[in-house]
Design a protein with these regions (language model features):
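Active-site lumenal/periplasmic loops and adjacent helix-entry segments of GT-C-fold
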Residues: 6-133
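Transmembrane signal-anchor helices characteristic of membrane glycosylation enzymes that use polyprenol
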Residues: 2-24, 212-229, 310-316
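Short, small-residue-biased leader/transition segments that mark boundaries at the very start
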Residues: 1-5, 358-362
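Periplasmic/ER-lumenal interhelical loops and adjacent helix-loop junctions
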Residues: 221-302
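Membrane-interfacial loop-to-transmembrane alpha-helix junctions, especially the N-terminal start
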Residues: 104-110, 151-158, 298-312, 357, ...
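Membrane-helix boundary/interfacial segments in multi-pass membrane proteins
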Residues: 78, 82, 121-130, 299, ...
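Membrane-embedded helix bundles of polyisoprenyl
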Residues: 92-98, 106-195, 205-228
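Transmembrane alpha-helices and membrane-interface helical segments
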Residues: 94-101, 137-147, 187-192, 288-292, ...
Length: 363
């Protein structure tokens, strides 16, 4: 930041979307002068709600946003560092751990999948994609909750799942939440089925702790929505995004943007964030998944679910859904370009899933 342009040391300057730094940074910093209270008189020159304009409000609802805790605990300088660095570091660690789980504990595949997600152009240009960091972390916690050997481990994991669940729900952006929600739900189903023996061993008192944690999650979400009720009401009464209805179609081109994404650091474009994608070699992962399913005779539930979702998302991105189907599946809240983003994630999950199935057990 600053008021004087400084010439770069090396390379060429490119225009870049400014929302994530030139807009957000001043908003975060103004909250300090309100002591992170309910109202902010600085950002718009009049009374506005801090939680709506800055996302920072020191109350019970702040439990829904772990990346902001640094502001309340250590002040704005360290808080901003945490805000920028914590989600990215978390995504790196947890994406590798997530792929370690679905790759049958194959470390090479785990690192490969984790790097393809965490260091993808999609993550780099958007920076700190919240539904990825909290979603994948929640999946890891759920897996280890199911497969934990000791009660204390499940008691620690339960509130972690609750906070991550609250964070995911309070993203309040269904364009990402709906398609990613189907993916995450499918993975949870696979975790339960594949670990059914361990799932049945979960004790009653452990379920009670988990249930209490879910109530804890619900309380955070309710308070958060109450604190943001004015903002939510105003947004829902707008033409965009409040009244937007999507039925899909005509966005499959975006699935091939991974080719261009590689060159975005070297060639200026109008909106790198919108067009960036994970490098997936689409549609090859889907073709290989079909081959593997035929060869494995459909015995891998995760591969079946991920390929099924890939086919559904491909249909939505090409020809679209009838309006009634879009409404029933909640895809009416999902612009086709956003569905393509999640289709990209599926194209990373698929090759990790079928590659580990084709490797020797002890490889």
């Amino acid at each position: 930041l600053g008021d004087v342009y400084k010439r770069q040391v090396y390379g060429e300057t490119h225009s870049i979307r400014s929302d994530e730094w030139a807009v957000s940074t001043p908003r975060y910093l103004t909250a300090k002068y309100t002591d992170y209270g309910k109202y902010n008189y600085i950002i718009m020159g009049k009374q506005t709600e801090n939680i709506a304009q800055t996302g920072l409000y020191k109350s019970y609802s702040a439990l829904a946003k772990p990346q902001t805790w640094g502001y309340y605990l250590f002040g704005d300088s360290i808080g901003m560092s945490v805000e920028w660095c914590f989600p990215f570091i978390l995504l790196i660690v947890m994406s590798i751990q997530f792929f370690y789980i679905i790759a049958g504990k194959n470390k090479v595949l785990a690192v490969t999948g984790g790097v393809m997600v965490a260091f993808s152009g999609y993550e780099m240009w958007w920076m700190n994609v919240e539904y990825l960091s909290c979603g994948l972390t929640a999946l890891v916690c759920i897996y280890y909750f199911i497969n934990a050997e000791k009660t204390w481990q499940r008691m620690v994991l339960s509130p972690c799942i609750a906070i991550l669940g609250a964070e995911y729900i309070t993203i309040l952006y269904p364009a990402f939440q709906v398609p990613s929600g189907y993916v995450y739900f499918g993975i949870v189903v696979w975790m339960v089925v594949s670990s059914w023996d361990n799932f049945k061993k979960i004790k009653l008192k452990e379920w009670l702790v988990f249930a209490a944690s879910m109530l804890f999650m619900a309380s955070i979400v309710i308070v958060y929505l109450k604190d943001r009720s004015t903002y939510v009401t105003e947004i829902m009464n707008t033409i965009y995004p409040g009244s937007r209805v999507s039925t899909g179609g005509y966005s499959l081109y975006k699935m091939f943007e991974y080719v261009a994404t590689i060159f975005y650091p070297f060639k200026a474009t109008l909106n790198n964030s919108e067009f960036s994608m994970m490098v997936t070699l689409f549609p090859l992962p889907m073709v290989m998944a079909v081959y593997c399913i035929i060869k494995q005779k459909g015995k891998d539930i995760l591969l079946d679910i991920m390929l099924g979702l890939s086919c559904v998302y491909t249909i939505y991105c090409t020809v679209g859904f009838p309006l009634i189907v879009a409404r029933l599946t909640l895809f009416s809240y999902v612009p086709e370009e956003r569905a393509a983003d999640l289709l990209g994630l599926l194209q990373v999950i698929l090759p990790v899933s079928y590659t580990h199935l084709t490797l020797p057990t002890n490889s």
